[in-house]
Structure formats: C-alpha cells, structure tokens
C-alpha cells in the first residue's frame, strides 16, 4: 500500500464551548514502518466499522470548501501540507461551532491500493495504557486508539475523478441513533448521502431470495448459494469495497455466470451495478429451508419471532401475513 503523502495535526478542544486550539504540523510525516503499520491498522478498523454511509460531495461553495482544496492539491496548485492546513483550520472552526465536539489528532493520508488512489481523513484519540521499559519498570504509556474510531471518511479519488455519475465515492462513519455529534465532521468533508447502503443491501437480498425461489433449487444448493453471497459480501465489506453485481452473479452460478445478473436486470429491482455491503443487514440474513412430502418451506431467519413462530415441542410453524399471491391461490383452491 504505497503512501503518497501523510500528515497529522492536533486540535485541542473540550465539549464545553471553549475555543479550539490548533497545533499544526509544518511538514509531512516521513516514510517509516511505523507509519505503514498505523495506516494499515486504521484501514482495518475503518473497514470493520458498521454503520457507514456512502455518498458524494456537495457542490463547491463557501460552506463546503473541502472538495475545492482537494482538487487544487490534485491539480498541483498547492502541496499536500498546504491542503491539509486549509482543511484542518476549517475543521477547527466547525468544532468551535459544535459544543459537543472534542479535539484529537487529525490524520490526512493519500495512499494507493491496487490501481486506486484514496484519501483518508480521521480524527484519532489517545488511550492511556502501561508499558514495561528497558529497566523493567512499569510506566504510563499513551497510544492511538484505532479501535475506537468514530469520526472518519475515505474518498475514492480515482472514482471521483473518473466517474462523474458516481454517487458513492465517499464513505464516512455515521453517528449512532441519529446523534448530531458527528454532523460537523460530515459538513467538514462536505459530503451528502448518495446511496442507501442498508436499503440497497436489503433489495439485493430480496432479489436473491426471488432468484432462488424461481430456480426451484434443492435445499443444499440454495444453502450453498446463500453462503456464497454472504461470504462475498462480507469479504468486500472487510476490504472496504462495494459488491459488484456481475462478479457476484459469476460466483453464485459458475456454469451460468450471467443468470443472477440477468434476473436482477429483467425484474428491474433498481439496483446500482456496485452496491456497498451493509454488515448489519447481512448479519440478519440467513435462510431456513425444508422440503418433504410435497411441502416446501423457505424463509429468512430475521422473520422468526416476528412473522413466523416456531413451537419446538409441537413441531409447528405459525405464519402471519401470508403473501397475497398465496392467499389468492388458497381462496381459489
């Protein structure tokens, strides 16, 4: 993972309305194994983070200047240090306007993964710990707590520059339960949500369920294809990459690599060619299936306890809210 440029600034700020104090670094960080390890750990923590949103920049304006500064840097109208200085000063201002915000170390990293350029911006905090020194004494020690990552964004620079239609070249961590504490950071980046990752993932899973049902697959085959989908989606989420429908289709049915893709297009589910995987939605998706003596039952695990009740002692399933099509067939029968 070649690191093109990386720098860290510090903002001192308490959540009590006091002014934020900026300690800006004048030069980029030099290349070292420690820097590479830190960025690798940061990426791993970010990829594992649930509840991310995907979107795009707002139009350039005085309220959202970040994209203009980034463009100036990429066009070589200013260097990376100057770009980061403009950005962190803007973040300092937004922090002062948000009483709930706290300071920390602000990291800017421009790096390359494969053929793709990324910019990661993250607000990092320290944790107190202990260490054993050379004289075998136990001493206090601070370390960057990359596991507690609450404010961060990653911009796919290559996607932004080369795909003008994209609405998902930025990912960012959303605040939990609608909290406003992270809004200032989203405004700092100047991004808006362009893709509903949970909704897109649910639609994909619905399309997959319809596909499996239409194929009338044996139970074992249906389970294998489900595991393939969940495995691929989970793998992409760990990499921080979206799912590609054509690639997924080829994995689901190697003999007919276009079958699932054509099913999606023919049914017009409205899915984008690339979908960011939502881990929470994926974790809820697992199918229970069974077939015997002319009876075939298949349903998603998250319906158990809501629309479907299982009585283990009686060996019965109670199903509520039957599909309209099934009810109509039963009436006619």
From Swiss-Prot:
Alphabetically ordered keywords of this record: Cytoplasm, Plasmid
Main location: cytoplasm
Superkingdom of source: Bacteria
GO MF terms held by the record: double-stranded DNA binding; single-stranded RNA binding
Subcellular location per the Swiss-Prot or TrEMBL entry: Cytoplasm, Nucleoid
A single cellular component GO annotation: bacterial nucleoid
InterPro entries attached to this UniProt entry: Nucleoid_associated_NdpA
Pfam families associated with the record: NA37 (PF04245)
Keyword Cytoplasm annotated: yes
Entry keyword annotation includes Nucleotidyltransferase: no
NCBIfam families: PRK00378.1
UniProt-listed HAMAP family: NdpA
Family: Belongs to the YejK family.
Protein name: Nucleoid-associated protein
Species this chain originates from: Metapseudomonas resinovorans (Pseudomonas resinovorans)
């Amino acid at each position: 993972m070649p690191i093109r440029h990386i720098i860290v600034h510090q903002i001192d700020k308490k959540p009590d309305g006091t002014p934020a104090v900026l300690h800006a670094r004048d030069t980029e960080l030099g290349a070292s194994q420690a820097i590479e390890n830190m960025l690798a750990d940061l990426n791993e923590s970010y990829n594992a983070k649930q509840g991310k949103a995907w979107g795009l920049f707002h139009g350039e304006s005085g309220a959202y200047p970040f994209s203009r500064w980034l463009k100036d840097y990429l066009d070589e109208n200013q260097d990376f240090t100057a770009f980061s200085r403009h950005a962190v000063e803007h973040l300092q201002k937004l922090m002062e306007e948000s009483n709930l915000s706290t300071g920390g170390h602000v990291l800017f990293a421009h790096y390359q993964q494969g053929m793709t350029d990324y910019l990661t911006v993250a607000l990092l905090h320290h944790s107190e710990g202990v260490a054993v020194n050379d004289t075998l004494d136990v001493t206090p020690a601070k370390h960057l707590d990359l596991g507690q990552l609450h404010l961060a964004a990653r911009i796919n620079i290559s996607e932004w520059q080369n795909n003008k239609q994209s609405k998902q070249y930025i990912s960012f961590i959303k605040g939990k339960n609608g909290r406003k504490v992270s809004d200032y950071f989203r405004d700092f980046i100047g991004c808006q949500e362009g893709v509903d990752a949970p909704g897109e993932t649910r639609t994909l899973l619905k399309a997959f369920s319809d596909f499996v049902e239409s194929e009338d697959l044996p139970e074992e085959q249906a389970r294998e294809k489900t595991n393939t989908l969940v495995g691929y989606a989970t793998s992409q989420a760990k990499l921080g990459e979206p799912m590609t429908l054509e690639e997924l289709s080829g994995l689901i049915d190697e003999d007919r690599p276009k079958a699932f893709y054509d099913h999606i297009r023919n049914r017009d589910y409205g899915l984008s060619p690339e979908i960011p995987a939502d881990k929470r939605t994926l974790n809820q998706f697992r199918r229970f299936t069974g077939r015997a003596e002319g009876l075939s039952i298949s349903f998603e695990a998250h319906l158990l306890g809501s629309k479907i009740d299982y009585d283990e002692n009686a060996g019965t399933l109670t199903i509520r809210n039957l599909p309209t099509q099934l009810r109509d067939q039963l009436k006619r029968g």
